[in-house]
Amino acid sequence: MNRSPSTSGLLPLPGTPSSSWALYRARLSNMFRNTDVSVVIAFWLFGLINNILYVLVLSAAQDLVGTSVPKGAVLLADVLPSFLTKLVAPYFIHRVPYSVRIAVFVALSCAGMLVVAAAPVEGAVGVKLLGVVLASLSSGGGELSFLGLTHYYGHGSLAAWGSGTGGAGLVGAGLYVVLTGWIGLGVRGSLLVGALLPSVMVVAFWGILPRGPLKGWKGGYERVAEPGEEEDGEEGFEDVPAGAASAGLLAPGPSVAATAYTHHHEGRTGRASFWGNVRRARALFFPYMLPLLLVYVAEYTINQGVAPTLLFPLDQSPFSEFREYYPFYGFLYQLGVFISRSSTPFIRIHHLYLPSFLQVANLVLLTLHAVLNFIPSVYLVFVVIFWEGLLGGAVYVNTFAEIMENVPAEDREFSLGATSVSDSGGICIAGFLGMAMEVWLCRWQVSQGRDYCRRIEAS
């Protein structure tokens, strides 16, 4: 059966040779007409709650730990367990039913919140970091599981998940400020409120999400027939014409994964051996994992190592204090992420390396400015930071959209979960790079007579 982006439920980039506005509107209308609203709502909530807890626990843990522990240690406690979970779990988690997984993740999330909240305000750093670790385990396991779950519910579920994860950054950053500042609950009270949030995932999975697609689950990675596929459904990369991917301006030629999956195909039993999954993961590295890893290394190095030093004289900015720069950069970044992670129903990017390399260019540009101070206005930096968020969100959601579209159905569930290790791996690498770069860049700026980064600490 021949499939292309034009028939997969994903839209080409407007203005490309294979698209017209009339055709584009027709496809868009068809996509939403065939989308189950309950699926969209459930996956949007999955993405929101799974990621908002990550943001909320990190913010609260930093406040509770105070100055006794470097921020980098808290960051690594929040990222490393998630990375290790995504690295290991795809090879055995397929034996655990989704209902059991979600129950465990909800319990871990609640426990993480409660452990951090119950720890004494002074000291008990190890206990607080334990709470962060529990929340990180839940976040990592949740991401790879919910991405795998989109295999059963189609492209609409993936778009909703991506939008929810993008919204989590904005909502999470604002929620902690509202709870601690506006409402005045304090750190502990805010965490206790946060411990209730995982119940939303319970409602979404058992109360909102249609369970029909999961009724045939047999305790392994499952193949789901494509809409309109014939019973004998001989699907694979061999059946996709070489020009099928050309429906978007950024589309590459035949997928790099095509040959790999042709050679490493394990059959259509729906269950895969450990070594079969290892071969699948190797086939995913260059077409999907590497561009996602690159974009995360670049953007989180910017966020953690470079952005804190992108400071201008206050009379040349809209701010009254130097410490106001970084939160606003974070807001612009999260806004860009939310927009681009919500964009796959409208715009698709097929060549994942292009935005990844553009993100690396952003890192180089902003690092050079931190050293040489050549960008004349902070408003230009605002544009670059917003662009950074757009690129990062676009690579994330389009990576999984490409897997959904190009990887054979019998390999897709594993591939969606296994590829998620790249984002946590990129954050871990960037965490180490960022700690070193922030210190070095600040020292360099002070030596050049620009001591703005030191004034943040004094604020």
Swiss-Prot record:
Presence of the UniProt keyword Endoplasmic reticulum in the record: no
Location, primary (coarse class): membrane
Superkingdom assignment: Eukaryota
One cellular component term (GO) for this entry is: fungal-type vacuole
How does the protein's chain sit in the membrane according to the entry? Multi-pass membrane protein
* Subcellular location(s) per record: Vacuole membrane
Q: Which InterPro entries match?
A: Battenin_disease_Cln3 (IPR003492), Battenin_disease_Cln3_subgr (IPR018460), MFS_trans_sf (IPR036259)
Q: Which GO terms describe its biological process?
A: L-arginine transmembrane transport; lysine transport; regulation of intracellular pH
Q: Which residues cross the membrane?
A: 37-57, 73-93, 102-122, 129-149, 167-187, 189-209, 240-260, 283-303, 325-342, 352-372, 374-394
Q: Which UniProt keywords apply?
A: Amino-acid transport, Membrane, Transmembrane, Transmembrane helix, Transport, Vacuole
Q: Coiled-coil region(s) at which residues?
A: none
What the protein does comes down to: Involved in vacuolar transport and vacuole pH homeostasis. Also required for cytokinesis.
Q: Give the similarity note.
A: Belongs to the battenin family.
Indicate what this protein is called per its UniProt record: Protein BTN1
Species assigned in the record: Chaetomium globosum (strain ATCC 6205 / CBS 148.51 / DSM 1962 / NBRC 6347 / NRRL 1970) (Soil fungus)
